[in-house]
Structures are given as C-alpha cells and as structure tokens.
Amino acid sequence: MGSGDAENGKKIFVQKCAQCHTYEVGGKHKVGPNLGGVVGRKCGTAAGYKYTDANIKKGVTWTEGNLDEYLKDPKKYIPGTKMVFAGLKKAEERADLIAFLKSNK
C-alpha cells in the first residue's frame, strides 16, 4: 500500500464516512463510532459505543494494513459488522483515507 494524501482523504471522509462517523479525537459517536485516533486502537473499544459481538471478537489493533483490508470490504473482514458501507474498491482512495485517519491523533 502506498502512502496516501491526507487532504484528499479528508474529502473522502466527508463524502463517504461523515454521515455515520466523526473524526475529531474525543468526538461524539454517531451511527458508527468516533474514528479519532483509530489507527493503533483495538477494534471494538471506543469508549461509550455499543459494538457488535463480531467487532469485539475480531480483537485486532487497527494498523494501516488491516484498515486497508477492512475498508476494501468491511463485511468480508468482519462478518457480522453493522457497518453498512460496501467499501472503497480503489486502493488509492483507501490509502488517502487511512493517511487522513492517521493524521488525526
């Protein structure tokens, strides 16, 4: 996976993620959990958010690599997730979005 463009990643977040997620560290949850500081956080552990058992049991710590895999096809990576988003098929868009999420600490 190449290094992404965080500015473009922010645009992708606003277009495709912001309906269900916030990204400011410590921000409120929406339909989905707040994603501020998600890189390096264990899956299913954002305080105050009710995750599915599938997300909790996955037990991974989010890295660039597994976020890329998840964002490509969320329901394949975590069967039983309640995330309805179909995924980002373009590797460049995933790299940009991950660069944006990493920049948000």
UniProtKB/Swiss-Prot annotation:
GO terms for molecular function: cysteine-type endopeptidase activator activity involved in apoptotic process; electron transfer activity; heme binding; metal ion binding. Keywords: Electron transport, Heme, Iron, Metal-binding, Mitochondrion, Respiratory chain, Transport. InterPro entries: Cyt_c-like_dom (IPR009056), Cyt_c-like_dom_sf (IPR036909), Cyt_c_1A/1B (IPR002327). Its main location: mitochondrion. GO terms for biological process: mitochondrial electron transport, cytochrome c to oxygen; mitochondrial electron transport, ubiquinol to cytochrome c; oxidative phosphorylation; regulation of compound eye retinal cell programmed cell death; sperm individualization. Heme c binds at residues 17, 20-21, 83. It is found in: Mitochondrion intermembrane space. Gene3D superfamilies: Cytochrome c-like domain (1.10.760.10). One of its GO terms (cellular component) is mitochondrion. It comes from the Eukaryota. Binds 1 heme c group covalently per subunit. Electron carrier protein. The oxidized form of the cytochrome c heme group can accept an electron from the heme group of the cytochrome c1 subunit of cytochrome reductase. Cytochrome c then transfers this electron to the cytochrome oxidase complex, the final protein carrier in the mitochondrial electron-transport chain. There are two cytochrome C genes in Drosophila: Cyt-c-d (distal) and Cyt-c-p (proximal). Belongs to the cytochrome c family. This is Cytochrome c-1. It comes from Drosophila melanogaster (Fruit fly). The gene is Cyt-c-d.
